[in-house]
Amino acid sequence: MVTELRVFYLVPLLLASYVQTTPRPEKMKMDCYKDVKGTIYDYEALSLNGKEHIPFKQYAGKHVLFVNVATYCGLTIQYPELNALQEDLKPFGLVILGFPCNQFGKQEPGDNLEILPGLKYVRPGKGFLPNFQLFAKGDVNGENEQKIFTFLKRSCPHPSETVVMSKHTFWEPIKVHDIRWNFEKFLVGPDGIPVMRWFHQAPVSTVKSDIMAYLSHFKTI
């Protein structure tokens, strides 16, 4: 099985060294709009195994970090860092949710059942498994984007003012608040309202510092 995975994903692995680059944004993080209509509790998503629709209202009272992920990306090194972030901040109510997507460099080519083996045996490999919930693979931009991402993007301006059109991106139409690449992040507060958004190039250490500063207002750290 390991050999089959390595052969099947040869092309995505060659592409994994490619991380979309843009002119450095003015900010790595942006606060979300103050007049957001609705909450994440109005939405749900299909679990990675396809057996369960998980309503986001089950995360009421939690601080939720939404991340669009990919197995064969140069930023896949963030997976272990996200595991550590979940472990460190879980006692303070943080929940990380991962959403596999193949729209950026086609770096999530497998079906849902192939994603966890790819992570475990290929990249990051060495038996790695995420300690946070993964959902079924789907679009985060374009006409078939998941509704939760329509809501998140509408609620939060993008840190970069540059809209990138590239042969490595696969969706239409292109919109100003679109996710630019794998591993962008949105933080949602315990009331279900989006709080802040990070550019994909923001280090997880920076994301952690920002979240801890935010949590300090709740007197939980």
Swiss-Prot record:
GO terms for cellular component: extracellular space; sperm plasma membrane. The keyword Signal applies. InterPro entries: Glutathione_peroxidase, GPX_AS, GPX_CS, Thioredoxin-like_sf. One of its GO terms (biological process) is cellular response to oxidative stress. It is an enzyme of class 1 (oxidoreductase). Transmembrane segments: none annotated. Keywords: Oxidoreductase, Peroxidase, Secreted, Signal. It catalyses: 2 glutathione + H2O2 = glutathione disulfide + 2 H2O. Its EC number is 1.11.1.9. Belongs to the glutathione peroxidase family. This is Epididymal secretory glutathione peroxidase. It comes from Mus musculus (Mouse). The lineage of its organism: Eukaryota, Metazoa, Chordata, Craniata, Vertebrata.
